[in-house]
Every structure is written in structure tokens, then in C-alpha cells.
Amino acid sequence: MRHIASLIAMGSPFFRFKRFTVWHDRCAMKVGTDGVLLGAWCELPEVETQCMHVLDIGTGSGLIALMLAQRLEQNRQRFKIYAIDIEPSAVEQSRINFEQSPWALHLSAKNSSMQEFYDDEGFDLIVSNPPYFQNSLKNPDKSRATARHTDTLTYAELLAHAKRLLKSDGRLSLILPIEAETEILKLAKINKLTPTHITY
């Protein structure tokens, strides 16, 4: 992970992976360790014959969606990944990154909140590196504050809407601060979501 930290410290406007490049100069949240870990770690459900539907909530630069596209292609899985974000600049950034990737036909970005997003088919997998600060001092940059604070997407809303959007056998993969574990497990139970893997 030293390579990621050094690129961010130098203020690089992009991060280059093996098969794609992520530009992050227009969005509030830059490429970081959390997103890279979630993109590499989240378990891909086994979906036979049909096309796997994936939703990336709060996509930012589109990093996680791109990592999942690469993994799904390697698995020879048919897929469609939808990426949503409430910040128009992040959506524009992710669209650019998607269009320049080898999976442009499988990726789409939309300016939408999770609360307002609907899809008739439901999703096999929902991923998110959600806002994580609660009741703490906010960054003066409004876009960065939105990306980092739970005001626009609380954990309760995140899990309730994930339940609404998931297929009956779908999976939700999140990366969260350890302090949120008790609350998340409680909300998972309320929403009838069963934890299968917790990694520290």
C-alpha cells in the first residue's frame, strides 16, 4: 500500500492499475486504501447463466466499480455495473474513467442518491465505501464533507435501501470504521440481512 500513499501524497491526478487508470482530480474523495481494499476483497456471488447486476453506492471516481469489472471479466461473468453518486462532479469523473476503460459497455454512472434510486430487476451485489463520520467537525469543502459525513446517507438508510434494492439472495459489501460495527450488526438484523464475513 506504500505505492498508493506516495501517489496521493504527491498530489497525482490519477492512479494507474494494470488494465485501467482512475482519474480523481474532479471528485472530492481521492483513490485511497479503503476503496482499493473493498474492490479487491468483496466476495462476488455466484450467478449462473444470467447477467450479474451490481450497484456501487457513492462511486466517487468509479474505482470500486472498475475493480469489480476487472474481476468479473476475469471470472468470465456477464455483468452490468451501475454506479451512483449525489455529487455531479463525481459522476462526471466516473463516466470519464468508465469510458476510458476496457469495460465501458458494462459500466454506467448516474447522479442519484441511494434513497431516490430504483431498479426493477434488483441487484446481486451492492458495494459501498459510505460516508463514515458522525457528529464530527466538517470539512469546509462541501463536496468533501458530503462524501465523508453520514448526514446525506445514514447507516440506517444505507441498510434499509440496500435491502430494498437487493435480490432475495443478493449480497451487500461495505467497508466501515470499527466503531460502527455494533450499529451495523443491529441494523442488519432489523433489515433481515445476515452477516457472512467480517474482516478486521
Please place each PLM-identified region on the residue numbering:
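General small-molecule cofactor/ligand-binding pocket signal
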Residues: 23, 82, 108-110, 196-199
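Conserved Class I SAM-dependent methyltransferase catalytic core
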Residues: 27, 31, 153-200
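A generic structural signal for alpha->beta connector loops
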Residues: 19, 51, 78, 104-106, ...
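Conserved SAM/SAH cofactor-binding pocket of Class I
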Residues: 40-119, 125-128, 134-139
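Accessory (non-catalytic) regions of SAM-dependent nucleic-acid methyltransferases
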Residues: 2-9, 195-200
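Class I SAM-dependent transferase core
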Residues: 4-46
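Mobile active-site "lid"/loop adjacent to the S-adenosyl-L-methionine
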Residues: 130-157, 161
